[in-house]
């Protein structure tokens, strides 16, 4: 089965390298990623756990695979080899037990299945929740990763499986630590505000680290193309923002009142990413991978989402 192939794009002798790509967990992030890669001329396979999910993948024009990474037997049927693999899987709900099965056990199962037929690049999407800093400090990829939550510790252990595989067997893993994703139908603080149930913990000084879905997709593609195996990259936009600033902007933009202030311990939004307070730095993503953000801050991204909702008569 061929892996790399070239596609002629005209008489000028220009060629695009066509690769076989597998997207694991082809859902909120993985599906638009697959569509974008398909538009670039690649052969894209999307893995989902159910036949219903696979049907969504097929309707998007991708080649569906039904398998569950928590079941080693399911992975035996993967049509290996692939040039690129992007693991964008989500645990859904279920807390730490689900994280253990999907992220840690799933990663271990994938490494075992790919041992004899590794890809040229393997992208793992984790979370900035592995950073437990609570002092509003800046965090870069080399900052201490001491998660404050059980799920954060599981995510860190899953990363370590991949780093060990890189150091011991040169497995081409690139690790992405993704901030809170927002976009169509997603974005905890934005959606809470639009529903009228948002609350501001304390004085609203805790920082939010966010990234728009479109930029997650773009950054993953940049990592597939240029990411260095064994390296970690933070995926967050240019502006970590205090909650008070975020909600003031929404209030002014929409002409709605500010959310109420509540004690930190009673906040509805508390605990989404542990009791952390940090400013995630994306410098390495931009300088090393050359990524340019479509939505550099929450202002551009939330404005686009608000406009989308208005055009759909949902706001």
Model segments located where?
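A conserved pocket-lining segment of Rossmann-fold NAD(P)-dependent short-chain dehydrogenase/reductase
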Residues: 191-211
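NAD(P)-cofactor binding segment of oxidoreductase domains
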Residues: 81-123
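Mid/C-terminal beta-alpha module of Rossmann-like enzyme folds, strongest
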Residues: 219-220, 226-270, 315
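Conserved C-terminal active-site "lid" loop/helix of NAD(P)H-dependent oxidoreductases
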Residues: 248, 267-292
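Conserved Rossmann-fold NAD(P)-dependent oxidoreductase catalytic core, especially the SDR/UDP-sugar
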Residues: 109-150
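Catalytic helix-loop patch of NAD(P)-dependent Rossmann-fold dehydrogenases
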Residues: 135-175
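Amphipathic terminal alpha-helices
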Residues: 297-315
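Glycine/proline-rich active-site loop of Rossmann-fold NAD(P)-dependent oxidoreductases
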Residues: 156, 168-171, 181-191, 201, ...
């Amino acid at each position: 089965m061929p892996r790399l192939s070239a596609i002629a794009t005209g008489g000028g002798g220009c060629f695009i390298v066509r690769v076989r790509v597998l997207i694991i967990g082809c859902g909120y992030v993985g599906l638009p990623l697959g569509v974008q890669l398909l538009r670039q001329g690649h052969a894209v396979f999307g893995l989902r756990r159910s036949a219903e999910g696979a049907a969504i993948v097929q309707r998007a024009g991708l080649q569906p695979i039904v398998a569950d990474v928590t079941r080693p037997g399911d992975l035996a049927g993967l049509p290996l080899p692939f040039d690129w693999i992007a693991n964008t899987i989500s645990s859904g709900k279920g807390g730490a037990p689900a994280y253990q099965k999907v992220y840690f056990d799933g990663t271990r199962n994938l490494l075992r299945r790919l041992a004899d037929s590794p890809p040229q690049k393997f992208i793992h999407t984790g979370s900035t929740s592995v950073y437990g800093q609570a002092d509003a400090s800046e965090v870069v990829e080399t900052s201490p990763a001491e998660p404050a939550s059980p799920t954060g510790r599981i995510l860190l252990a899953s990363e370590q499986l991949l780093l060990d595989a890189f150091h011991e067997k040169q497995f081409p893993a690139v690790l992405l630590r993704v901030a809170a994703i927002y976009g169509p139908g997603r974005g905890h603080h934005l959606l809470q505000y639009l529903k009228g149930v948002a609350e501001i913990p304390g004085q609203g000084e805790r920082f939010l680290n966010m990234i728009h879905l479109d930029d997650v997709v773009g950054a993953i593609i940049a990592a597939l193309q240029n990411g260095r195996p064994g390296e970690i990259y933070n995926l967050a936009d240019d502006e970590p923002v205090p909650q008070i600033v975020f909600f003031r902007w929404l209030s002014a933009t929409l002409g709605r009142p500010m959310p109420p202030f509540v004690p930190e311990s009673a906040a509805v939004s508390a605990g989404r990413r542990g009791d952390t307070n940090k400013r995630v730095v994306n410098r390495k993503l931009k300088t090393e991978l050359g990524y340019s953000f479509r939505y550099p801050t929450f202002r551009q991204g939330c404005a686009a989402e608000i406009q989308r909702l208005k055009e759909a008569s949902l706001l």
